Amino acid sequence: STVDASLYNLLVYVDDASSENSQSYSFPTLYRLSKDKRGNVTKEIIREYKEQVSTDPSVMQEVMKRAFTEYPAESYGLVVWSHGEGWIPSPLPIVKNASTRWIGQDGGHYLNITDMVSVFEAVGCHLDFILFDACFGQSIEVAYELRNNVSYIIGSPTEIPGPGASYDKVVPAMFASENVGVKVGKAYYLSLIHISEPTRRTPI
């Protein structure tokens, strides 16, 4: 399916895992993706940042405020593509070596769900959907934390395949004219069920 770029905006914030000293390093950048007349994907740089911890709530807040201010819309959705372990905050000093639960990782720094809620409330946004393209992104606890900020939460209570979703299938659903959350959920599920075992182990 095609998406009319004149009606919608697809913004992507990228902070890759390479170190500042590596040849492949690039600064954290906010892009706007679209297609040219030939159907080729193009990316426009909206803002290039200095090196920063992208899981810091203040960083997420600045990026979201910029996106909403410069590209206002009738509705919004969010995709979080990263690692994840769910809901219990990180760090967890009470029990040594216990697994913590979080969504989003930048080196040794993590974004807790409660921090994400604080960002949404500071920005003043209500999302049509949030897609956690990350392991352990869906649970009753996560849904409860986000109940006042998001209409639909899409994710997996277990691991997901390493590459994540097939965005050629998911992106058109993100810009559906109605039932966006339902359509994103279906597109995400369908993009994963065709992956052959043993990689596929992802309830949605």
What are these regions (language model features)?
Residues Y167-F175:
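Short, surface-exposed amphipathic charged segments that create phosphate/polyanion-binding patches used
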Residues T2-V3, V63-E70, V119-V123, L146-N149, ...:
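Structured segments of extracytoplasmic/periplasmic soluble domains
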Residues T55-R66, D115-S118, Q138-E141, E145-N148, ...:
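Extracytoplasmic/secreted proteins, especially bacterial periplasmic and envelope-associated proteins
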Residues S177-S191:
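A conserved active-site cap/scaffold subdomain adjacent to cofactor or substrate pockets
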